[in-house]
C-alpha cells in the first residue's frame, strides 16, 4: 500500500498536470480585479452571514456594479483579490431576455432552483426561508414595487454534478441571501451564498458522453473517479458566490450577469483548486444558463411548474421504479463505453442497495432534469415516457 507521502506526491503531480493542461486550453492572463471593488464585495459577502443588518446599503456596492457593467479585456481571467487565502475567479455574460424571465424560471417557488444549471448543480432546495420552513417568495411579482430593496435570506442545500477534472461530487449547505432592487432605475437581482460547513466527503461520479448532454451518474462511493485516486477523501472546504443580474438596454430585452466565485477544496486540508478551475466551472454554468433562458420554445413557467409538482407527488416506491428505468436507459446508452464510466453504472445496477441510498430529493432531481432535457430537445417523448404520460406532455406543450 502506498505511504501517505507517496499518495500526496501523486495527488500533487496530478493537480499540477491538470493545471498545465488548463493553462494550454485557452485561458488568458490572470488579472486582479481593481482594489476599489473589494469593499463592496466584502459587504455583499457579509450579507450571507446568519446575522446581518437587514438594511441594504446600495451606495456601498457602487464600485462592484460599475465593474460588472464596465468593458473588459475579453482574453483576461479576472479574479477578486479581497481574500488572499482562497482561489477565485470572475465571469460575466449576457442573457437575451428580461429579468422577469430570469426570475420566472430560476427563482420560482414552484420550479426547482437547480433547473437553470443542470450541468453544474445536481439538486438544490431551500431548507428554510427567513427563519421558517416555507416556499421562496414570488420575486417576479415584486418587480413592480421596488421602492425599497427586498431581501430574502435562508439556508439552501446543494449538491453539484461530477467535476470535469476528477469526477467528484459534493453536497453541502449554504447560507443564501437574495436582494431584489432597482439600481439607477434598472431592476437587478443580487444572489449571495456562503458555504456553512465543510461539505460531505467527495464521491465518485461520471460525466457520461459530452458534458452538454447533461447525463451524469452518481455512484455513492467515496473517492475520486480517476485512476490511482480512488482512495482520496476530498472535501469542499469553503465556497462563496456573488451573482449580479442587472437589466441593460430597453426594458425586458437583456440582462447582464457578473459572477464572483471563491472556492477552496482538496484533501487533508490541502487546497487543490486554482483560479483556472473556478473559471472553467463558471463557463460551464454560463453555457447552460444562457441556453435555457434564451431557448425559444420553453412552455410558460406555470405549465413547467405543473410537471415539477407532479414529480413531487410520486411515492418513494414509485420514484425508485422510475429511477431504475432511468438507470437502465443510461446503461443501454453508455454501458459499453469504458471511457464514460459504463463499468461503474453496470456495477451499481447489480447492487441491490443502490436505489435505497438515494434520497427523495435525489430521485426527484433525476426526473426534473430529464424533463428539462426534453424541453431543450436533448431527449424525446419516448425517453421520458416512464414518468410523464403522452397525455401530460400534450397538455404542457413547448412554447
Feature map (PLM): residue ranges:
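Sec/Tat signal peptide C-region and signal peptidase I cleavage site
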Residues: 19-23
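N-terminal secretory signal peptides that target proteins for export/translocation
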Residues: 1-6
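Bacterial N-terminal signal peptides
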Residues: 8-18
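Terminal "cap-and-tail" regions of soluble proteins that handle hydrophobic small molecules
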Residues: 24-399
Amino acid at each position: 500500500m502506498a505511504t501517505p507521502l507517496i499518495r500526496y506526491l501523486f495527488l500533487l503531480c496530478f493537480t499540477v498536470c491538470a493545471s498545465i493542461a488548463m493553462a494550454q486550453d485557452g485561458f488568458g492572463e490572470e488579472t486582479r480585479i481593481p482594489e476599489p471593488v473589494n469593499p463592496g464585495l466584502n459587504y455583499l459577502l457579509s450579507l450571507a452571514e446568519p446575522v446581518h443588518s437587514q438594511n441594504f446599503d446600495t451606495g456601498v456596492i457602487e464600485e462592484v456594479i460599475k465593474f460588472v457593467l464596465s468593458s473588459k479585456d475579453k482574453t483576461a481571467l479576472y479574479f477578486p483579490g479581497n481574500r488572499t487565502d482562497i482561489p477565485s475567479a470572475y465571469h460575466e455574460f449576457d442573457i437575451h431576455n428580461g429579468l422577469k424571465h430570469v426570475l420566472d424560471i430560476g427563482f420560482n417557488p414552484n420550479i426547482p432552483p437547480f433547473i437553470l444549471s443542470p450541468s453544474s448543480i445536481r439538486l438544490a432546495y431551500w431548507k428554510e426561508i427567513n427563519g421558517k420552513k416555507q416556499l421562496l417568495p414570488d420575486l417576479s411579482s415584486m418587480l413592480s414595487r421596488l421602492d425599497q430593496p427586498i431581501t430574502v435570506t435562508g439556508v439552501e442545500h446543494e449538491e453539484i454534478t461530477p467535476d470535469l477534472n476528477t469526477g467528484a461530487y459534493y453536497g453541502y449547505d449554504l447560507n443564501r441571501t437574495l436582494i431584489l432592487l432597482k439600481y439607477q432605475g434598472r431592476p437587478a437581482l443580487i444572489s449571495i451564498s456562503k458555504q456553512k460547513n465543510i461539505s460531505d466527503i467527495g464521491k465518485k461520479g461520471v460525466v457520461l458522453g459530452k458534458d452538454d448532454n447533461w447525463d451524469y451518474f452518481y455512484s455513492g462511493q467515496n473517492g475520486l473517479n480517476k485512476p490511482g485516486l480512488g482512495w482520496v477523501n476530498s472535501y469542499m472546504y469553503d465556497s462563496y458566490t456573488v451573482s449580479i443580474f442587472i437589466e441593460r438596454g430597453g426594458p425586458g430585452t437583456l440582462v447582464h450577469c457578473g459572477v464572483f466565485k471563491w472556492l477552496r477544496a482538496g484533501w487533508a486540508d490541502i487546497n487543490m483548486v486554482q483560479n483556472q478551475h473556478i473559471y472553467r466551472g463558471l463557463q460551464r454554468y454560463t453555457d447552460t444558463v444562457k441556453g435555457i433562458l434564451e431557448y425559444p420554445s420553453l412552455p410558460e413557467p406555470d405549465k413547467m411548474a405543473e410537471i415539477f409538482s407532479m414529480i413531487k407527488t410520486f411515492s418513494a416506491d414509485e420514484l425508485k421504479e422510475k429511477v431504475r428505468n432511468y438507470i437502465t436507459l443510461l446503461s443501454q446508452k453508455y454501458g459499453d463505453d469504458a471511457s464514460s464510466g459504463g463499468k461503474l453504472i453496470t456495477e451499481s445496477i447489480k447492487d441491490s442497495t443502490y436505489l435505497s441510498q438515494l434520497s427523495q430529493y435525489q430521485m426527484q432531481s433525476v426526473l426534473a432534469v430529464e424533463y428539462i432535457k426534453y424541453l431543450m430537445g436533448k431527449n424525446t417523448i419516448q425517453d421520458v415516457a416512464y414518468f410523464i404520460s403522452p397525455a401530460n406532455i400534450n397538455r404542457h406543450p413547448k412554447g
